[in-house]
Amino acid sequence: VMLENVTGILRAFKVDGKPRYAWFEVAKAFASIGCDYVPICLHVNARNVGAAQNRPRYIMLGFEKKLFKRILSKGSLGAEGKKAFNKSLKFFENIQQGNVPSYDASFYYDLAKSHPIFNEWPFKDLNKNPFEGEPHIATVSDAIHDIRSPEGISQPSDYVKMINRLSPSLNTLSKYESGLPPNHKLRAHGARVKARFRLYQVMAKIANKPIVNNLKSYLKDPVNNPITDDLVSHLSSEQFLSMDGGFRSFSSKETLEKFLTPMQTKKQTQRALVADSPAPTALSIADDACHYDKEQLRTLTVREMARFQSFPDKFEFRSKVTTGGRMRQFEVPQYTQVGNAVPPLLGKALGKMCKEFLS
């Protein structure tokens, strides 16, 4: 069996004031009498198998006891794999005998911490970038730059070509009826929203955290968080979108404050994507992020979010694009479908690993 969950499952919760760990409790449940699975627990990331998104995930593999012992006895596992399998077998046997093990944080193996098990068969499939040639971490730009304009597709990146080869029965690089892939309806926004998105783009480029924090604080509470001279100096060379649709710069505190006043918001979760980095994890709501391109002051389409996760373009999402209120009890909109999905490249890597175990 395989269980997939978000990284949050690794964090503790309190029961009667004492820390408990959901992932460890689930592993114990699978190892208990009547269930009889030997667990191997992993913490992996979709970007390590080629997806253009930083998407860490907890994976638990549950092996039927006979299969587990057969794999352990065959001699194919490396030193770290043998160590992990022996540790899991002892964990399983203790639970079967009624000896409940104490919490052990080392019972899951973390790719983010470069655990050496991911250099060995078959776990190395979860740390194998599919790009040919030099190792390459896929970026936001790799994933969506060719479909940024409503006028049609430009030259796709190697990343896009790769994900469109994932399922030959679904995908070709032939032109679509509209010139653009499905689920790629660009959203329209008013002047103030566009101006705010341009502000987020500027903020995303600033490496100086105190400057960014000053700007965020001012937008949230201008009375108690005035603009500093350093902020004005830092932003003076940047171009902002004014309410009349033109781009302009601000060299004085007074003009910058006047421009920022309509931008004030208590919503602090929105941000602009960074073109040369993988997309962030939290992308499941249409308003989570805006485009990185100065000419594309808008939120992301369903297709763009799907591209980050490595979904081929011919994989079409159905249902409503968005929904809300009571209807969320009955409907799963397209943005939620993408946000809750397992990236195909990660699914493929996990499947390959399981196939190797079974063979």
Predicted regions and their residues:
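Class I S-adenosyl-L-methionine
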Residues: 2-253
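Bulky hydrophobic/aromatic "packing anchor" residues in well-ordered structure
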Residues: 44, 144, 282-283, 308
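A short catalytic or substrate-binding loop motif that flags glycine-/basic-rich loops and adjacent residues
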Residues: 51-54, 261-263, 273-276
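FAD-binding beta-loop-beta segment adjacent to the flavin cofactor pocket
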Residues: 270-280, 290-330
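S-adenosyl-L-methionine
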Residues: 319-333, 346, 350-359
